Amino acid sequence: MTTPLVEMDGDEMTRILWKMIKDELLLPFIDLNTEYYDLGLNYRNETDDQVTIDAAEATKKYGVAVKCATITPNHARMDEYDLKKMYKSPNGTIRAILDGTVFRAPIVVKGIEPCVRNWKKPITLARHAYGDIYKNTEMYIDRPGKVELVYTSEDGEEKRSLVQEFKAPGVAMGMHNMSASIESFARSCFNYALDTKQDVWFGAKDTISKTYDAKFKEVFQTIFDTEFKDKFEEAGLTYFYSLIDDIVARVMKAEGGFIWACKNYDGDVMSDMVSSAFGSLAMMTSVLVSPQGYYEYEAAHGTVQRHYYRHLEGKETSTNSVATIFAWTGALRKRGELDGSQELSDFADKLEKATLSTIESGKMTKDLALITSIENPTVLNSRDFILAIREALEKML
C-alpha cells in the first residue's frame, strides 16, 4: 500500500471484531498501511469529539476511510461512560464535513434468500442526508388561530402563505432543503452509478408537492441532462424518475441491480425495508460518497451492545462480522483502484469470496443459521467464524 487508509476504530462488540479482522484476515496477508483514529466513545469524550473532526479531515486528505460502528450517546450512555456532554452522532459529523451521500447495499449470498422472490441482485439505496423533517421546526397548536409560512428577505421584504386556520388544537411543522444539497446528492448518485455500473431510479411526490418535491425532480433532471446523459449512454446506463409510490411498486417487481435514490425520510424507511427483506442488517454494506470523490466505508449496523455485554461476562458470542469485513474490502479495493494497485484490489475480491464461500459451505454465525435455506448449518462463535474465513482465504492465495 502506497497511500494510507484512514482507519476509524469504534465501540463495543464491533471494536472486538475489528481487531480480530485485522489480526486474522488482513495483517498476515497484506502490508496494511493506515492512519489510525480512535472513535471509541471514551476517546471522543477525552478529546471533546475533536478526534471525529480530525478523522473526517484526514479522509479529505487521503480520499478513502474505513470506519467501525460507534455509539451515538443517549442519557443512559452519558451515565455509563461518565461523559462530559451528549456528543453528536460521529456519522452525522463526518457526513456534514464530507458533504456525502450514504449508499447501502445488501451482501447477497447463496443460502440466504430474499423475502421478495424475484430479487436476484442487490438494490443499492441512496439516502439524501440533509434537511426535510430531520431539520424541522414543530409546534403544538393548543387554541384557535392561524399558522403561516413567512419568508423575510435580507432587505426586509416579506412573503406570507397561510398553512392552516386552526379552529381546534393540532400540530404544525416547517421544514426546508437547500438547492446546493440536492445538487450534491444528485451528483453523488450519478457518479456512484457510473462507478458501480448501475442504473439510477428516483422517486418523489411532485404531483402533490408542486414546489418542494418538484424541486428535487427538476434538479435531478437538469444535472442528469447537462452533466451525465452522455456518460450514461456511453456506459449503457439509464436514469428513471417516477412518483415515489410507483417506484415502490416497481422495486417489488424488479430483480434488483440498480441504485434507488431516496429523499431523506423515504431513505430512512426504505433502507430498513430493503435490508430486512434481503435477510439482515448484518449483511448490509454502507459507503459515504462525497461529490469531491472521498469515500468512507462501514457496516450498516450498530455496535452490537447485547453481545458486547455477554463478551464482558466471559460468555461466548456468535456475532456476524460480514458487513465489517466488507467495509474493509470496500475501502481496500477503492484504495487499490486509486493507487493503481491491482494486487490490493484482487486481495479485497478474494477476501469477499472467502467470506461468502464460508457461509455457502454451511459455516455461519447464529443469526444467519436462523434464516438460511442450507440444511444443518454449522453455527460458529465470533472468532471461529473469522478463522473459518481465514482458512478459505489461505486456500485462494
PLM regions and their residue ranges:
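Glycine-rich phosphate/diphosphate-binding loop of Rossmann-like nucleotide-binding domains
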Residues: M1-M20, L149-S242
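N-terminal glycine-rich phosphate/adenylate-binding segment common to multiple enzyme folds
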Residues: N42-E158, Y265-V269
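N-terminal alpha-helical transmembrane segments of multi-pass membrane transport
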Residues: M13, L17-W18, D23-D48, A56-T59
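Flexible, glycine/charged-enriched surface loops at secondary-structure junctions
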Residues: I30-Y36, T196-A204, F228-Y241, G336-A348, ...
